Amino acid sequence: MADVVLGSQWGDEGKGKLVDVLCEDIDVCARCQGGNNAGHTIIVKGVKFDFHMLPSGLVNPKCKNLIGSGVVIHLPSFFEELEAIENKGLDCTGRLFVSSRAHLVFGFHQRTDKLKEAELHETKKSIGTTGKGIGPTYSTKASRSGIRVHHLVSDEPDSWKEFETRLSRLIETRKKRYGHFDCDLESELAKYKVLREKIKPFVVDSIEFMHDAIKDKKKILVEGANALMLDIDFGTYPYVTSSNTGIGGVLTGLGIPPKAINNIYGVVKAYTTRVGEGPFPTEQLNEDGEKLQTIGCEYGVTTGRKRRCGWLDLVVLKYSTLINGYTSLNITKLDVLDTFKEIKIGVSYTYQGKRVTTFPEDLHALGKVDVEYVTFPGWEEDITQIKNYEDLPANAKKYLEFIEEYVEVPIQWVGTGPGRESMLEKNI
């Protein structure tokens, strides 16, 4: 059976730390969607590891790690990230595997991404993409013109010729679309001949890999990237990523059935942040927002961009819970609220004089809602050294209990600091 860790907001909730804690007793950790547009930071014994594409389970020396078929992979970035974490002392030998069905991100995908974003910026409709080529790669996947890992590594006769043909067509299509598009086929082929041999030892049939693990009753943890509000179907479209970031993406990205899922853990930051463009009802463009940003060190792991900050939005969390079916929640970064005299939680929206308790799909309406808040007294004390949930200040527990009651899902963990030791487990 597989447990799943999913982001419940707009990403950057701190999923990596929960994955790190859970991986201490896990046999397999798998990524199911997204690419290196995501970012997790894990601190182990004072050493900081930044994960973008690779599964966070690599910090556990006994855990095998899979990049599933729903992930899109930029091979140069894959090897750069692998080298970076190995240089910090992680031995990944024989523990990292890549699905033969995963699609490849090429340099021209990344250039296309940036050119499209520049065009949108001129029309003031910028999405705020990371520029990593994720969207254009999923576009070629959907149009059935993409290149998968097996196209690159296959030893079948004429397989390299097919790879050349596919790559040539993709490059020519972009040259026709962008007259100034710079991408040389021969240099790309030379680069990928080298990468072909480097990636081969990592490649597996991910369907067989996952189902063997399920059959052998291995403990499996699936690490979702991004978050539900960035889902291509259920997020604040078009200000979303290009994959299914909810529970559906777990099934399609790994090729496992619903009955293989056990627990679904929703990770919730104690306030709300968002990177890039798009609606954000509880955003605080004031001293409170600046304080959250400063104390929370709210900068994107992947882009370095400053995150927009606001109060916790329970309309968003309730919506996310309905879709993903969380069995329990992990509240992160509660300590960021330590110095606030008052703390607010958004509980409903009002649009054109009417109360709205569900999340609107119409962004025009969403941009005009007024948020109804419940105000809580702060605890105004340092909680970073607290080791047991029961020892949290009374006002902190009231804040957490309100969240539980509103979304009707128990809180299982509370984060009170950056390290893996700063995770309080609550009896549920």
From Swiss-Prot:
One matching Pfam family is Adenylsucc_synt
Quick one: which residues bind Mg(2+)? Answer: 12, 39
Q: Which reaction does it catalyse?
A: IMP + L-aspartate + GTP = N(6)-(1,2-dicarboxyethyl)-AMP + GDP + phosphate + 2 H(+)
Q: Does the keyword Nucleotide-binding apply?
A: yes
Pathway(s) the chain acts in: Purine metabolism; AMP biosynthesis via de novo pathway; AMP from IMP: step 1/2
Binding annotation for IMP: 12-15, 37-40, 130, 144, 226, 241, 305
Q: This protein's superkingdom? A: Eukaryota
User: What enzyme category does the UniProt record give?
Assistant: ligase
Provide the alphabetized UniProt keywords: Cytoplasm, GTP-binding, Ligase, Magnesium, Metal-binding, Nucleotide-binding, Purine biosynthesis
Per the Swiss-Prot or TrEMBL record, the active site comprises: 12, 40
Residues holding substrate? 301-307
PANTHER family for this protein: ADENYLOSUCCINATE SYNTHETASE
Subunit and interaction comment: Homodimer.
NCBIfam families recorded for this chain?
PRK01117.1, purA
Please give the function described in this protein's UniProt entry: Plays an important role in the de novo pathway and in the salvage pathway of purine nucleotide biosynthesis. Catalyzes the first committed step in the biosynthesis of AMP from IMP.
Q: Which family does it belong to?
A: Belongs to the adenylosuccinate synthetase family.
- What protein is this chain from? Adenylosuccinate synthetase
